[in-house]
Regions:
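Acidic/histidine-enriched alpha-helical segments
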Residues: 66, 122-147
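Contiguous, non-catalytic segments that form substrate-binding/exosite surfaces or channel walls
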Residues: 151
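Active-site His/Glu-centered metal-binding helix of metallohydrolases
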Residues: 48, 52
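Catalytic Zn2+-binding segment of zinc metalloproteases
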Residues: 53-58
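Short, surface-exposed helix-loop/turn micro-motifs enriched in polar/charged residues
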Residues: 40, 61, 128-131, 135, ...
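N- or domain-start disorder-to-order transition segments that initiate the globular core
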Residues: 1-27
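M16 family metallopeptidases and their MPP-like homologs
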Residues: 16-18, 24-37, 43-45, 63-118, ...
């Protein structure tokens, strides 16, 4: 059964809940849908989910963040980028055990919701209002390494090139994470 549990039309936010006794885990995710306009914009957006999932204002370093996730029975945070047609989808998600398996009636799902809210609305910024430089550079390097790995995986690379050629000059032809050149120029 799916219920709309939160809706804010002013910012286009809608939250749904789908409960089932079939699974032992809970997953909360936020999907930010952005138009694909240029490879540079795609590259800039592609860095955001992973760097946002590293630290927040509430959990300013990886150790504090990891400790909180461990307290929630080994919960985890996931980030990613995908593309559907002319849209780039930035995904941030938190997963953990279902509440019925927590000791003492602890509300793990509420804690996961707080963590996800913190990632989406209060990511860690430096005094200039930018992502911390070291974390940003690490995620930029990681994104470049992912593109290199795709090149070495021939089926993925062939699909990517086919899409680029079929949709050349159109938003759907822009790679979901931008191009190597665009990723290198992101600041």
């Amino acid at each position: 059964m799916t219920n709309t549990i939160l809706e804010r039309k002013d910012c286009g936010l809608r939250a749904f809940a789908c409960e089932t006794p079939q699974f032992k885990t809970a997953r909360l995710s936020a999907h930010l849908v952005l138009p694909l306009t240029t490879p540079e914009a795609a590259a800039a957006h592609a860095v955001v989910p992973n760097i946002s999932a590293r630290a927040t204002r509430e959990y300013p370093d990886y150790t504090a963040f990891g400790k909180r996730l461990a307290e929630l029975y080994g919960a985890s945070v996931h980030a990613g980028v995908s593309r559907i047609g002319d849209s780039q989808i930035l995904t941030l998600a938190a997963s953990g055990i279902a509440n019925r398996y927590a000791f003492g009636g602890e509300d793990v799902q509420a804690a996961l919701a707080e963590i996800l809210e913190s990632i989406v609305f209060t990511p860690l910024f430096d005094e200039n209002g930018l992502f911390p430089e070291d974390g940003f550079r690490q995620e930029q390097r990681q994104l470049l390494e992912t593109l290199d790995a795709e090149f070495n995986e021939k089926r993925i690379y062939a699909k990517r090139r086919c899409t680029e050629l079929m949709f050349a000059g159109e938003p759907a032809g822009i790679p979901q994470s931008g191009t190597r050149e665009a990723i290198r120029t992101v600041t």
